[in-house]
């Protein structure tokens, strides 16, 4: 850049700082490159698929899928993880269907959870915006976008046509709330439902409710599906679940994770530790037997999981080791007083 252009640019930058405040505009290189802060999803595989170890703070996330696919369960696990880190969480229950007993079973501290059950969509989004602007909320969940009914629709008669009301409501709210979410460094999760587009002959007929605004404003979009049942004998005790990262602005997208959701327990994290441990060679598998550090820890996956359940320090060590291997930037915890050297991505 020649001297005259450089001088004009500096004059413009100083005028902007005087008029709008320091830091309004800056060079991207002036701000130190920091790792994107994230909150774990409760699933080791999904944390790895997201590329940053969880869902990004200061961003909007959309989780959508069919009924009974695990959308609310996944968000409750995120809330539980955030609370363990000392965070404050809020749940805007537009569906009026949150079960505190189930939430508590998943590890949520229901006494500290802020909950709102609004009367209409405008109230729900206004409450959400006020909570975000307080700067004190780390995770905000809206369950669900489909239940954000505009006031005009509630006050109208059954059968009245209200074309595009909900889409306009979401578009206006997201324009207003996005900047506040970034400034407050709050993770905002919108749960959404699936609808079918009429008359689609080719391609995917599925779409989400509330218009297109949420698709654009979301930094991460997760498509969650139930793909099978977990059985103990003839009894169904959980669901096999697949989550696809269909949009990701903070890491490479289109990855997917598969895990089990056990009824009354949540995501089967120990099962994931066993599977990833075997895949990375941290746990040895010979036939049905699993071994760790040369010692047999169980015959069959269920017994190996029980060993980890009884030996929490081993489970924690393996989890941190797996994260260090797959994410490359998280230091493993020391085991039994021994220093564990961090393995970088280049050494893999």
From Swiss-Prot:
GO cellular component: cytosol
Any one of the GO BP annotations: DNA recombination
GO MF assignments: ATP binding; ATP hydrolysis activity; ATP-dependent DNA damage sensor activity; damaged DNA binding; single-stranded DNA binding
Pfam families found in the cross-reference section: RecA, RecA_C
Positions with a binding annotation for ATP: 65-72
Location in the cell: Cytoplasm
Function: Can catalyze the hydrolysis of ATP in the presence of single-stranded DNA, the ATP-dependent uptake of single-stranded DNA by duplex DNA, and the ATP-dependent hybridization of homologous single-stranded DNAs. It interacts with LexA causing its activation and leading to its autocatalytic cleavage.
Family classification: Belongs to the RecA family.
Protein's name according to its UniProt entry: Protein RecA
Lineage start: Bacteria, Pseudomonadati, Pseudomonadota, Gammaproteobacteria, Cellvibrionales
């Amino acid at each position: 850049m020649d001297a005259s252009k450089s001088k004009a640019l500096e004059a413009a930058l100083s005028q902007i700082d005087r008029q709008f405040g320091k830091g309004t505009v800056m060079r991207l290189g002036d701000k130190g490159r920091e790792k994107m802060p994230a909150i774990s999803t409760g699933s080791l595989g999904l944390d790895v698929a997201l590329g940053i170890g969880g869902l990004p703070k200061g961003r909007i996330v959309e989780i959508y899928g069919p009924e009974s696919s695990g959308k609310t369960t996944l968000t409750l696990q995120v809330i539980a993880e955030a609370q363990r880190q000392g965070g404050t969480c809020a749940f805007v229950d537009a569906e009026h269907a949150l079960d505190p007993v189930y939430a508590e079973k998943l590890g949520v501290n229901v006494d500290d959870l802020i909950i709102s059950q609004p009367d209409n969509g405008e109230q729900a989004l206004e409450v959400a915006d006020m909570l975000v602007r307080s700067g004190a909320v780390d995770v905000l969940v809206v369950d669900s976008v489909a239940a954000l009914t505009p006031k005009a629709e509630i006050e109208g008669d059954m059968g009245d046509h209200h074309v595009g009301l909900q889409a306009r409501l979401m578009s206006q709210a997201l324009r207003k709330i996005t900047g506040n979410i970034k400034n407050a460094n709050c993770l905002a999760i919108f749960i959404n439902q699936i609808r079918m587009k009429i008359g689609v002959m080719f391609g995917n007929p599925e779409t989400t409710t509330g218009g297109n605004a949420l698709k654009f404003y979301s930094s991460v979009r997760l498509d969650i599906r139930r793909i099978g049942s977990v059985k103990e004998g003839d009894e169904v005790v959980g669901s096999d679940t697949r989550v696809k990262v269909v949009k990701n602005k903070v890491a490479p997208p289109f990855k997917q994770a598969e895990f089990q959701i056990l009824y009354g327990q949540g995501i089967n994290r120990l099962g994931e530790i066993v599977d990833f441990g075997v895949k990375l060679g941290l746990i040895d598998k010979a036939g049905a037997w699993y071994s760790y550090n040369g010692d047999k820890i169980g015959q069959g996956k269920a017994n190996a999981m029980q060993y980890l359940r009884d030996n929490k320090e081993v489970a924690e060590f393996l989890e941190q080791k797996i994260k260090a291997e797959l994410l490359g930037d998280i230091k493993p915890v020391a085991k039994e007083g021994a220093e564990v050297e961090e393995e970088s991505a280049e050494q893999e």
